[in-house]
Amino acid sequence: MAPHQKSRINRINSTRSVPLRLATGGVLATLLIGGVTAAATKKDIIVDVNGEQMSLVTMSGTVEGVLAQAGVELGDQDIVSPSLDSSISDEDTVTVRTAKQVALVVEGQIQNVTTTAVSVEDLLQEVGGITGADAVDADLSETIPESGLKVSVTKPKIISINDGGKVTYVSLAAQNVQEALELRDIELGAQDRINVPLDQQLKNNAAIQIDRVDNTEITETVSFDAEPTYVDDPEAPAGDETVVEEGAPGTKEVTRTVTTVNGQEESSTVINEVEITAAKPATISRGTKTVAANSVWDQLAQCESGGNWAINTGNGFSGGLQFHPQTWLAYGGGAFSGDASGASREQQISIAEKVQAAQGWGAWPACTASLGIR
């Protein structure tokens, strides 16, 4: 149906008169009576088309005649009140509601609706199932144009948002994750992380997790040690190390980037170092003396531990020569390791030589007897 421009309304004009020569008084009487009749049938009518009103003066006696005079053309699905064949009276209102095509999208599902509703609000009431908690992308008072309209409706969903470790459960009428964050006034920083794409469609019971990431540059002065200088000592057992000259730490300015996630440090990366004072390396004497294979000590270790120099069975003795912890530490083994199992073959033999010198072969009574060493 297409409303047209209001037709020109002819009105009785009393400002100008046309002199008539009347032959008889009977003719004059007839004209007078006709004029009174015309005035009596003139009606002031309001035509309301989709909320837009026009006033006109008509001589028509029916609604159909009034609409024809107003230039209103009706479509098959348009609604007229009163009906077209209804008689019309002075100061009546004729209401026309034209049929429009509306694409109604509810949660992504499209419905093509033919409606005579004037506004979006009227449409939603007509369709039903839409509540005040739903989000509508159009102004409820917006007039639906003749060309039609697309209206999207989003239902609320209960979701959880974990923002930097703080969890909130909310009901939001949002189409996607981005809209949900906007409704909660949540902004993401350039480094922040989120577990779902922002354009992902929001569903009931969705769980959104946001990790707040902060990168901070920290500069501090720290001490450092230089790599030691080693000097071989052929008289000391292999693996034996003795500090000949102490070193001294240096200092340097270190700049690093510290990344925190939800307030907890995740990583620290050095990006620059500037040496302030040089470090002095320590001088360490390192023994190179080895004990020949198949020595008496190897035979004794074979008897005591099956030749396993790293054994520690938890029975109170350890190492290839089965040192008791007190004996090991008393004769200097702590310089190599907390127990004999952590020391090398040569280091264990060097301690064993000290024990043998102090206690004799009786420190290993059973095995030295079976080997015929004593």
Curated annotation (Swiss-Prot):
EC supergroup of this enzyme: hydrolase
The segments labelled Disordered in the record are: 228-252
Pfam families noted in UniProt: DUF348, G5, Transglycosylas
Keyword vocabulary terms for this entry? Glycoprotein, Hydrolase, Secreted, Signal
Induction / repression: Activated by RamA and repressed by RamB.
Annotated compartments: Secreted; Cell surface
Question: GO CC: one term?
Answer: extracellular region
- Cite the GO molecular-function annotations of the record: hydrolase activity
Instruction: Name the source's superkingdom.
Output: Bacteria
Checking CDD domains in the record gives: RPF
User: What SUPFAM superfamilies does the annotation carry?
Assistant: Lysozyme-like
Q: What happens when the gene is disrupted?
A: Not essential; a double rpf1-rpf2 disruption mutant is also viable. The double mutant displays a prolonged lag phase and slower growth after transfer of long-stored cells into fresh medium.
Q: Where is the signal peptide?
A: 1-40
Q: What does the UniProt record tell us about how this protein is modified after translation?
A: Glycosylated; by Pmt, by at least mannose and galactose. Other unidentified sugars may also be present. May be subject to proteolytic cleavage as multiple shorter forms are detected in gels.
Which InterPro entries does this chain map to? DUF348, G5_dom, Lysozyme-like_dom_sf, RPF
Q: What is its EC number?
A: 3.-.-.-
Q: What does this protein do?
A: Factor that stimulates resuscitation of dormant cells. Has peptidoglycan (PG) hydrolytic activity. Active in the pM concentration range. Has little to no effect on actively-growing cells. PG fragments could either directly activate the resuscitation pathway of dormant bacteria or serve as a substrate for endogenous Rpf, resulting in low molecular weight products with resuscitation activity.
The family classification in the record reads: Belongs to the transglycosylase family. Rpf subfamily.
- In Swiss-Prot or TrEMBL terms, this protein is called Resuscitation-promoting factor Rpf2
The organism named in the record is: Corynebacterium glutamicum (strain ATCC 13032 / DSM 20300 / JCM 1318 / BCRC 11384 / CCUG 27702 / LMG 3730 / NBRC 12168 / NCIMB 10025 / NRRL B-2784 / 534)
